Amino acid sequence: MMQFVIAAPRSGSGKTTVTCALLAALKKRGMDPCAFKSGPDYIDPMFHRSVLGVESHNLDLYLSAKNTVRELYAHYAAGHGAVVCEGAMGFYDGQGLTTRASAWELADALDLPVLLVVQPKGASVTLAAEIQGLVHFKPESHIAGILLNDCSEKLFRMLKPLLETETGLPVLGYLPRLPQAVVESRHLGLKTAGEITDLAQKIGLLADALEANLDWATLEALTERPDPAPVPPPALQTAGVRIAVAQDKAFCFAYAETLDCLRTAGAELVFFSPVHDTTLPEDICGLYLPGGYPELYARPLSENKTMRDAIRDAVNGGLPTVAECGGFLYLGQTLEDASGTAWPMAGVLPGKGVKVGRLVRFGYADMTAKADSLLFHAGEHLYIHEFHHWDSTDNGSGFSVWKNEKIQWECGFASMSLYAGFPHLYWAGTPLPRRFVSGAKFYQRQKRNTHD
């Protein structure tokens, strides 16, 4: 099986573009590829899914233990003909000023070769020096080959012998610049895949260009690895509860692994749209409001008053509810849109969502629960991630958040039927799915007893 990591010296080098082009080309060649993303990013896996038509999965060595990451990789890679892991940021850049949770640490943990994506603009010999530095920064860099991005054929033919001589690494090919295939960006990075109407056409152009300019035989020889050791499938529970999951253009940041863990714990997931549907699905015993871009759809969310009222009444009535980041903002009193206009929201929580215009409390952190609640025990610790340009006038105080070994802030609302806060939680390898489903089961029993 071909297995490798796509990495680059820095952000903005075109990793996602190259990854999507490679996935499409591999699929075209009948390789049945699957994809992973290093780190907590939600958007890149959406692009992978658009190419493959199957789920892409996150592997994060800050949010998860190494054994959990290895098990997730083996589980989701099983049965595929090729595995492509897209790195995040620069190759060695991880949490803070360390390599923790970097693309390099993932390659090292999984013992995978790395294809280094390099943009050659404005450099030649210096490019070789930079690559040498990356190769020798760690005793085992895992860098196996080089791919030039945004590169002309003429420049490729000039640089290939130079780079191979100076670095000892094969230059496997190049992806030329295609102005007609550029994907625009937005405040969380790239636009989501569902918002780009001509995405399939753009990726098709990129795949054709890469397929024509890549040394496939060498790539296969460098990246062929034994299939990951199989892991026993998780034992499926039969809790018999339905959990409603918000899923639309406003709420699109849910880890596929989280949803799978909820199913394994016994939940039947029922998807709905707070933008378009008028009420919650029937006979639900739990509600999951993930993150996304509610600030960009504040008006239609607000104008859907029947849905806002249904969610407010359900949450206030004790329906077990988890609301992360954008879902947390939706439960507030009002939410400002991009122009600063405040729109009424569900009104469950006291805070108002406000536009800040910069990243707020960005990055990895550690969160400690102050009291027992739906998802947590008092004193329990969980690794989290935050990434948002909006804030709330009341972020709650149910948790202490640690960053760089210091208490930085308090956040979150927690009760025996609620978790709501800005932090994104990674559920795989934790007791959270089981506890959420257990809370839903308890709610179901209470509801039946009331009706009896």
Regions found by a protein language model. Name each.
Residues 294-372:
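Cysteine-nucleophile active-site neighborhood
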Residues 124-235:
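Internal gly/pro-rich beta-alpha loop/helix module
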Residues 241-305, 309-314:
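Phosphate-binding active sites in nucleotide-utilizing proteins
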Residues 37-38, 171-179, 268-276:
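Beta-strand->loop->alpha-helix junctions that form or flank phosphate-binding loops
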Residues 112, 169, 316-320:
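A short helix->loop->beta-strand "cap" motif at the edges of active sites that frequently abuts
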Residues 107, 212-213, 237-239, 251-261, ...:
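C-terminal and late-domain segments of enzyme folds
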Residues 1-2, 236-242:
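A short, charged/proline- and glycine-enriched loop
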Residues 2-110, 118-142, 150-157:
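ATP-dependent carboxylate-amine ligase catalytic core
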